[in-house]
């Protein structure tokens, strides 16, 4: 009995061994006893080394066959029986060792996981996904392996009786997975396999592989291996084979110039087609199913057509899919249909099937496609591709033309690239790679001829077999790939004990080789080393061995051959073997040595794995040149394959979308040069093509049925022209601005006709110093000689556009896009001005700050945000991430739609809502792509099980049908479109070029004017594009500009002056009439004559003021001139009143003798009493006919009866001397301040000189005051003079004179106690002349002489002018009434250069302006600085802190002192904080005794000299500052809580804000650091957004009668919003505590932080990349400075200027330091003792904390729109950033 059992057992073991060798049988998980380690050679446990005894028995692991003790084999795992229908609970469990048990638990590397057939959603790998293909393999040398250890998986395997390599069996796998995951879902469908060799050959990858879109699993994952000849079959473009691409482009084959670029070209002024409006979403009952989607209001169409709004919220029918274009697509196709596949040789993908070929409508059916269009389309694609390769060859310095005896590289590369691209079908499963560069490798072989170059359908590597006796040529080879090494180690680096190694090494290696041989491989590929014993065993078994293969190469071989990399021999199964039709090893002597190499020829050994079953790897072998040339060609080939591959995918996608296939389009082709330093002379143009005029398309005349007729020309015309291409050298550029209008060309490859945009990959772009200037590049390619050709340089971004013989270089102007159309044809040239206020001169001086890198053009940087419309919450805040085209983080378009939008099991991690509850928004450049999803309850699209994705669109600009935008017929997305890069899909969507956007069959843009729908089952996704406003950033300019146009306030001042003058002259005329009625006719004629003359003078002067010639930067109407005329009218009123009084008293002298009167009119004048000459250097416009000045300064006007008056003042009696050369006034003698003769209180009587004119009948009061009789006088000898300080009299460039007259001096207040009477001027009649007949002198003295005499004779005492205020008018009273109504105070002495600044009691800036122009202020701020005073004790202001503590670490370097120097000698080095050691302030006091009472004004100017120097840098001139400050108005500023006084200057240039005492003390402390920081920022052009403070003053007024006194400290700050139309205004502190304005209505409402945060989800503020960087740099610099100065609680004021798309911003309120009261406030708010939210940080925190919070908030508030294509043109000094700015944002790249 025992013998029989033993025989039976032996027989069964033999049968089992034979069965294990049969390839058709799945091997069980238990290892055959033949592969168990022998008992006698194993004396200790393999794991714990314990000795085996009678008690401690040996136990073999049923999985690896090694011997262990009982403790080490205590685990068991389930074993799937051969009948996979056996229920799981009936599965047998087998004993395994601890290591195998851990492998089973981990599920990686063991057969339990690796044998699972991975299923793919990719339609490229299964007929389930609408490819309608079923394939069989003729390489059936694989047996279906075992699938042991599958838990939860049901598998059924039917074994056929045919055990041959071509046997047939079937397998049906049904894989299900229960449960639903929160953010990922995996479901599988059933599949049938009719061939045992058609198992999944793709390698298994972890489902947990990271994906930047989130952890999603595919819905359907299957893969099948078709026949090799089917994989390598020709691809067809709607029946147009690509395999027959000719090697030479015949002359009759033309290429269309219409570029269907996917690359974003520079935006034109095309506006939004669908602007996202207010979106209301309500979450309804889950069982209702009528979920509302988002509302969209399409507006702002680029033409005049009005688009009706589309109501997404209420129009559920908008989402209903239209009818299918092809009824056959509606049918649910069988899973495998052999007949359907027989005619489709396009392979696994079913690329470009006839049903989904070019175009829409009639072009999708074979019977509706003409051969002419197919041929023309093929010519377009091939022509542009050849042009691209020709350009790349030129970059590599490789000749494009045929050389003697050699074939052109252009033809060879074109053929190889197309062949490789057509064969390539990447693994589109979730774990597969998309990059075609990872599947096609290029090898260089310096032997043979160029035409020997070929595409190997497999892998070629530089390897050889270990032993020469091993086979090097095997047909139908079976490969086994082993990871690690084949040595006596369990796994790599796991060592065993020495004695165990000695005992078991040979036995183990023999068993391992036996296991390998049992699988019958022909070739063994090992990653690392192999033991010598094993090598001998393998040689004996006739197995070729290859060692030390790098892991990437192993992966490629495994991917192509279908093998799996086995970690150890314990996991062997026949299912893991690979296969290739031909394996061989060849040796090639390299005949063409490298340049400079001599001697022995190198022999290169190459190993071939040819005709692999899967099209997942190819090798292009380049031959026929030396190594150096082949390396250059290699770069071109690598890119050529990438370009050809993407060309096919993008073309198919556009065809599916319904892009119009019209050929005659007028867009130039753009070709980008790689990263090279090229100039205009070295630029090349090799792009073939032609231009056919485009007829105007009328949307109402075109229909979907006839998309071709409006724009087509016969194809025969398209194929009629040819040209040769050559490099253009030394072509003179057309100057910009000479009528040329151009358009910027984007540096991207634009594939003609079908929107293929390809950019150089990183591996291709390498800087090479190749001289392209002298090469001729004839290319036998059709093109019209008048074709506009563009060569764009990626590095410089200078687009060069060649049109015939014309040549234009891209303008450097920011925001101006340039395109020069065909010059020969006279095409219209257009300019799209994208930004209104760009300044070319400022841009040209700026260096490119962020140069683009080549990698930028191989990826797209987008911003993504997601929000739940059901809950109204933001699920995913806007963030940046980069998608590299076809890279590891890219996805096929089909998978993105399936995983992200159509996965009904998806639940958002944030809101737990499904995908249809969300709206996703991608932003890039100037547009946003909004994705909405809707679940249809009553409609189901067919083909869900097959994975069909349907496409259609609705045009928003076509006439409505039943109230809805018309829809196109829906089509099934082709397999090639399914595999399109999602990144390229986004690039297509955001591109704003006419070629890229493509026109639909109705003539409108697909991506701009249409809603694009994608449907799958009952899920529909809608993609819609809308333009967004990308704002640039405008920082406070370093030099303030003044707007001199359209200033209403100056017009009002002008009208007031004219009105006063008219009132004066009319009042005088009326008074003259009254005098005439009383009988005083004697003087009436003379009075009327003088009145007419003075009125004519006034009108002439006003005309000169209003119509003067002005230079750039000067006001059209000088307000200071108006002030002077206003003051002159006041004195003219006084003079006319005296004239009329005098005339009314002459009735007693009616009969006087005329001769006597005439003698009295011409009295002799003493030399000491001569009339001073009028200022010769005046440029006053008020000089009329009475007083005219020649350029030499001599008075040539008529002086009336005073014609004997000397024209030069006597130097012994006058106060001043004038220069002989005219104009400049200088003191006659320089005396120190202590030598003033006024110091001696000596009575000085006015003595009447001989011949002095005596005035009669004047008012006694006025006359007494006039000559000083009522005052204590001192007599000034005629030989004494009053000398002025030289610094006062020097001509300061800070104050350009209006009238360079005599500069009066306002003596300090303490010196005004001396009452001095001066000799009366000859122009002023004296009362001492008693002869009444001489009173006619009032008429004979011209008014201007009288006015100037007043200014000259009362320089030293403003009290003399007060006498005018004491005069009571009799005839002329209008001026007195104006004063009583609160008018300006004009009786104050004039300022420097006779400048008149009126003072208004309710306008503090007028007081400041007057003080700044006073001689006293100039004396105190003179260069010597003796009179500068310090008021620390009086003002209770602490001394400034040491400037050394304020030295923020900034990278801008030290201050350039030459930049800070002021032109004036007084202003030199005033900004240097170290030049003064104490706070220097100037105080000016002045007063007026007017009608309203005596008032004293005191103005204290803090840091007067430093502020003056700062203004010298930041302002065009000091006079502009004075003009602006002369008038102001109270301003109700909003947003602040301090309730302090606010005012604005009437020109809106400056803002006046009251400063509290604490703020003033804080500023005084850190003012030196402020001046230093601001000066450094300006000199180094470092970005800063501090709103410049140009002065801080204390203004005090005191009414002497009432004793009322007011004081106010104010600062003068630039108005950041000057000249702006701001719709929204934000005051941002970075805090959320009490930072919300509930009343946001109104145009001037200031919004706060919470208002901005609330608006961000729906209406965010977008800025460009460069603008964001500029903003951050400025904020970083300023906050660092403010924190060092212990300043906090500042704000960023942001105004949104929608007209210019700019953010006008600046930091304000930075005067407050962190003092003890702020400490206390912070503590109270933090603890919440007095109420308020406790969970929010207080607004008042320490400066360092405030800085960090402020920076973070400002970075978050403004969303950056990435745009990697725009040239960097941030201009720091005028704070302009480019309009969509791009992007290589440092630190924001999310990959």
UniProtKB/Swiss-Prot annotation:
Residue spans, zinc finger FYVE-type: 39-105
Enzyme Commission number(s) from the entry: 2.7.1.150
Biased composition (Acidic residues): 324-345
Tissues in which the UniProt entry reports expression: Ubiquitous with highest expression levels in the root hair zone, pollen, and stamens.
Gene3D superfamilies reported for this sequence: 2-Layer Sandwich (3.30.810.10), GroEL (3.50.7.10), Phosphatidylinositol Phosphate Kinase II Beta (3.30.800.10), Zinc/RING finger domain, C3HC4 (zinc finger) (3.30.40.10)
Binding site for Zn(2+) 2: 61, 64, 97, 100
Subcellular location: Endosome membrane
Function: The PI(3,5)P2 regulatory complex regulates both the synthesis and turnover of phosphatidylinositol 3,5-bisphosphate (PtdIns(3,5)P2). Catalyzes the phosphorylation of phosphatidylinositol 3-phosphate on the fifth hydroxyl of the myo-inositol ring, to form phosphatidylinositol 3,5-bisphosphate. Plays an important role in maintenance of endomembrane homeostasis including endocytosis, vacuole formation, and vacuolar acidification processes. Required for development of viable pollen. Might mediate recycling of auxin transporters.
Full protein name: 1-phosphatidylinositol-3-phosphate 5-kinase FAB1B
Gene that encodes it: FAB1B
């Amino acid at each position: 009995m025992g013998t029989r059992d033993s025989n039976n057992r032996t027989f069964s073991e033999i049968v089992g061994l034979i069965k294990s060798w049969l390839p058709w049988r799945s091997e069980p998980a238990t290892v055959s006893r033949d592969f168990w380690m022998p008992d006698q050679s194993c004396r200790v446990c393999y794991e714990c080394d314990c000795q085996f005894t009678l008690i401690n028995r040996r136990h073999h692991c049923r999985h690896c066959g090694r011997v262990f003790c009982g403790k080490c084999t205590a685990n068991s795992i389930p074993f799937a029986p051969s009948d996979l229908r056996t229920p799981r609970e009936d599965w047998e469990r087998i004993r395994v060792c601890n290591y195998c048990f851990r492998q089973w638990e981990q599920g990686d590397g063991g057969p339990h996981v690796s044998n699972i057939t991975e299923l793919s959603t990719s339609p490229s790998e299964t007929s389930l996904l609408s490819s309608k293909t079923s394939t069989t393999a003729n390489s059936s040398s694989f047996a279906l392996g075992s699938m042991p250890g599958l838990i939860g998986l049901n598998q059924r395997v039917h074994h056929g009786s045919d055990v041959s390599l071509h046997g047939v069996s079937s397998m049906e796998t049904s894989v299900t997975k229960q449960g639903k995951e929160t953010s990922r879902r995996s479901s599988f469908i059933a599949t049938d396999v009719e061939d045992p060799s058609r198992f999944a050959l793709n390698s298994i990858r972890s489902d947990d592989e990271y994906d930047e879109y989130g952890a999603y699993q595919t819905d359907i994952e299957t893969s099948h291996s078709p026949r090799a000849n089917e994989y390598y079959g020709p691809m067809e473009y709607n029946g147009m084979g690509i395999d027959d691409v000719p090697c030479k482009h015949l002359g009759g084959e033309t290429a269309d110039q219409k570029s269907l670029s996917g690359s974003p070209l520079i935006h034109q002024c095309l506006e939004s087609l669908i602007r996202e409006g207010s979106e209301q979403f309500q979450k309804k009952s889950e069982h209702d199913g009528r979920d509302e989607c988002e509302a969209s209001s399409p507006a702002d169409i680029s033409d005049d057509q009005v688009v009706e709004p589309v109501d997404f919220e209420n129009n559920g029918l908008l989402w209903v899919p239209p009818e299918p274009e092809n009824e056959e697509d509606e049918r649910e196709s069988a899973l495998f249909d052999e007949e359907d596949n027989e005619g489709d040789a396009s392979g696994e993908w079913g690329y470009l099937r006839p049903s989904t070929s070019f175009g829409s409508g009639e072009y999708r059916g074979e019977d509706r496609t003409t051969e002419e269009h197919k041929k023309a389309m093929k010519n377009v694609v091939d022509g542009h591709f050849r042009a691209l390769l020709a350009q790349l060859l030129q970059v590599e310095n490789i000749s494009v033309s045929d050389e003697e005896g050699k074939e052109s590289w252009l033809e060879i590369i074109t053929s190889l690239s197309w062949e490789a691209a057509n064969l390539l079908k990447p693994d589109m499963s979730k774990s597969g790679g998309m990059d075609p560069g990872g599947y096609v490798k290029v090898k260089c072989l310096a032997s043979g001829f160029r035409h020997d170059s070929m595409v190997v359908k497999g892998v070629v590597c530089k390897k050889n077999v270990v032993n020469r006796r091993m086979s090097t040529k095997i047909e139908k080879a079976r490969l086994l790939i082993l990871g690690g090494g084949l040595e006596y180690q369990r796994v790599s680096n796991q060592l065993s004990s020495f004695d165990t190694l000695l005992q078991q090494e040979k036995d183990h290696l023999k068993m391992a080789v036996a296991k390998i041989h049992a699988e019958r491989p022909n070739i063994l590929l090992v990653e690392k080393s192999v033991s010598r014993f094993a090598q001998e065993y393998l040689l004996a078994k006739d197995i070729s061995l290859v060692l030390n293969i790098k892991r990437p190469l192993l992966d490629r071989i495994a991917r192509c051959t279908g093998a799996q990399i086995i970690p150890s021999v314990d996991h062997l199964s026949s299912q893991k073997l690979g296969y290739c039709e031909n394996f061989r090893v060849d040796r090639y002597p390299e005949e063409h040595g490298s340049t400079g190499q001599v001697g022995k020829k190198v022999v290169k050994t190459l190993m071939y794995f040819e005709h692999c079953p899967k099209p997942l790897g190819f090798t292009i072998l380049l031959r026929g040149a030396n190594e150096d040339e082949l390396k250059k060609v290699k770069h071109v080939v690598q890119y050529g394959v990438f370009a050809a591959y993407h060309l096919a995918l993008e073309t198919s996608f556009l065809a599916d979308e319904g892009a119009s296939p019209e050929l005659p389009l007028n867009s130039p082709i753009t070709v980008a040069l790689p990263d090279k330093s090229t100039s205009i002379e070295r630029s090349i143009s090799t792009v073939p093509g032609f231009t056919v005029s485009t007829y105007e398309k009328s949307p109402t005349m075109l229909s979907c049925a006839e998309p071709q007729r409006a724009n087509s020309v016969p194809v025969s015309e398209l194929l009629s022209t040819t040209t040769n291409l050559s490099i253009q050298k030394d072509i003179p550029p057309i100057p910009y601005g000479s009528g040329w209008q151009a358009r910027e060309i984007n540096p991207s490859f634009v594939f003609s006709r079908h929107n293929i945009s390809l950019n150089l990959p990183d591996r291709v772009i390498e800087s090479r110093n190749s001289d392209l200037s002298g090469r001729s590049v004839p290319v036998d390619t059709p093109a019209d000689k008048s074709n506009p050709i563009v060569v764009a340089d990626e590095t410089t971004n200078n687009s060069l556009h060649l049109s015939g013989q014309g040549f234009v270089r891209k303008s450097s102007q920011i925001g101006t896009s340039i395109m020069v159309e065909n010059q020969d044809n006279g095409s219209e040239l257009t300019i799209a001005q994208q930004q209104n206020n760009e300044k070319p001169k400022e841009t040209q001086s700026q260096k490119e700050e962020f140069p683009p890198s080549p990698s930028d053009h191989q990826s797209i940087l987008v911003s993504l945000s997601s929000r739940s419309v059901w809950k109204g919450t933001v699920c995913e805040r806007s963030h940046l991430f980069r998608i590299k085209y076809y890279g590891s983080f890219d996805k096929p378009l089909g998978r993105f739609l399936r995983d992200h939008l159509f996965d009904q099991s998806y639940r958002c991690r944030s809101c737990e809502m499904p995908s249809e509850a969300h709206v996703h928004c991608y932003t890039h450049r100037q547009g946003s792509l909004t994705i909405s999803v809707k679940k249809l309850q009553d409609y189901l699209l067919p083909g869900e099980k097959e994975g069909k994705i349907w496409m259609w669109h609705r045009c928003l600009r076509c006439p409505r049908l039943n109230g809805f935008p018309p829809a196109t017929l829906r089509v099934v997305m082709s397999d090639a479109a399914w595999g399109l890069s999602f990144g390229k899909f986004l690039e297509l969507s955001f591109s704003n070029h006419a070629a890229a956007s493509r026109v639909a069959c109705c003539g409108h843009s697909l991506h701009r004017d249409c809603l694009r729908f994608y449907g799958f089952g009952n899920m529909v996704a809608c993609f819609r594009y809308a333009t967004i406003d990308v704002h640039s950033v405008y920082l406070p300019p370093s030099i303030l500009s003044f707007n001199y146009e359209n200033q209403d306030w100056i017009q009002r001042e002008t009208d007031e002056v004219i009105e006063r003058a008219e009132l004066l002259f009319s009042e005088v005329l009326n008074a003259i009439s009254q005098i005439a009625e009383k009988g005083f006719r004697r003087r009436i004629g003379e009075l009327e004559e003088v009145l007419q003359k003075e009125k004519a003078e006034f009108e002439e002067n006003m005309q000169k003021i209003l119509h003067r010639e002005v230079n750039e930067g000067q006001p059209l109407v000088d307000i200071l001139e108006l002030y002077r005329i206003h003051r002159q009218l006041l004195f003219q009123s006084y003079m006319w009143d005296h004239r009329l009084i005098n005339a009314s008293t002459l009735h007693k002298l009616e009969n006087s003798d005329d001769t006597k009167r005439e003698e009295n009119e011409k009295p002799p004048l003493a030399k000491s009493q001569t009339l001073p000459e009028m200022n010769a250097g005046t440029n006053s416009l008020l000089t009329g006919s009475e007083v005219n000045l020649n350029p030499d300064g001599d008075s040539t006007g008529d002086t009336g009866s005073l014609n004997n008056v000397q024209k030069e003042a006597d130097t012994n009696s006058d106060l001043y001397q004038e220069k002989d050369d005219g104009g400049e006034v200088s003191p006659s003698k320089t005396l120190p301040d202590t030598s003033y003769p006024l110091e001696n209180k000596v009575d000085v009587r006015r003595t009447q000189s001989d011949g002095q004119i005596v005035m009669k009948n004047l008012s006694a009061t006025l006359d007494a005051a006039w000559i000083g009789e009522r005052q204590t006088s001192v007599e000034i000898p005629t030989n004494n003079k009053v000398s002025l300080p030289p610094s006062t009299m020097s001509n300061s460039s800070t104050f350009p004179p209006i009238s360079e007259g005599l500069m009066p001096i306002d003596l300090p207040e303490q010196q005004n106690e001396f009452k001095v009477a001066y000799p009366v001027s000859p122009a002023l009649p004296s009362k001492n002349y008693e002869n009444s007949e001489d009173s006619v002198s009032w008429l004979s003295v011209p008014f201007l002489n009288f006015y100037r005499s007043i200014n000259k004779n009362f320089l030293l005492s403003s009290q003399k002018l007060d006498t005018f205020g004491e005069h009571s008018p009799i005839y002329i009273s209008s001026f007195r009434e104006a004063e009583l109504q609160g008018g300006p105070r004009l009786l104050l002495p004039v300022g420097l250069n006779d400048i008149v600044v009126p003072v208004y009691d309710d306008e503090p800036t007028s007081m400041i302006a007057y003080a700044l122009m006073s001689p006293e202020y100039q004396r105190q701020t003179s260069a010597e600085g003796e009179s500068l005073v310090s008021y620390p004790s009086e003002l209770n202001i602490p001394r400034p802190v040491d400037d050394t503590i304020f030295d923020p670490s900034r990278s801008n370097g030290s201050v350039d002192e030459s930049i800070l120097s002021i032109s004036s000698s007084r202003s030199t080095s005033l900004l240097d904080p170290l030049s003064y050691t104490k706070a220097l302030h100037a105080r000016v006091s002045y007063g007026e005794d007017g009608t309203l009472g005596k008032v004293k004004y005191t103005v204290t100017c803090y840091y007067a000299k430093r502020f003056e120097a700062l203004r010298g840098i930041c302002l065009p001139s000091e006079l502009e500052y004075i003009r602006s400050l002369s008038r102001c108005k109270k301003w109700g500023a909003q947003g602040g809580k301090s309730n302090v006084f606010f005012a604005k200057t009437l020109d809106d240039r400056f803002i006046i804000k009251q400063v509290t005492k604490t703020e003033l003390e804080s500023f005084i402390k850190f003012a030196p650091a402020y001046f230093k920081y601001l000066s450094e920022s300006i000199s180094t052009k470092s970005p800063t957004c501090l709103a410049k403070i140009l002065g801080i003053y204390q203004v005090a007024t005191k009414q002497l009668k009432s004793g009322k006194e007011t004081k106010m400290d104010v600062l003068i700050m630039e108005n950041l919003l000057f000249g702006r139309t701001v719709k929204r205004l934000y005051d941002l502190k970075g805090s959320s505590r009490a930072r919300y304005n509930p009343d946001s209505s109104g145009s001037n409402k200031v919004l706060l932080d919470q208002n901005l945060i609330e608006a961000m989800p729906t209406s965010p503020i977008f800025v460009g990349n460069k603008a964001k960087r500029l903003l951050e740099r400025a904020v970083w610099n300023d906050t660092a400075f403010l924190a060092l100065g212990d300043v906090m609680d500042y704000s960023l004021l942001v105004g949104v200027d929608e007209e210019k798309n700019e953010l006008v911003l600046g930091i304000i309120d930075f005067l407050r330091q962190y003092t003890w009261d702020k400490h206390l406030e912070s503590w109270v708010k933090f603890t919440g003792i007095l109420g308020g939210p406790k969970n929010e940080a207080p607004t008042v925190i320490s400066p360092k904390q405030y800085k960090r919070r402020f920076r973070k908030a400002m970075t978050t508030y403004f969303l950056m729109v990435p745009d990697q294509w725009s040239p960097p043109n941030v201009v720091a000094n005028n704070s302009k950033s480019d309009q969509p700015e791009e992007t290589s944002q440092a630190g924001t790249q999310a990959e």
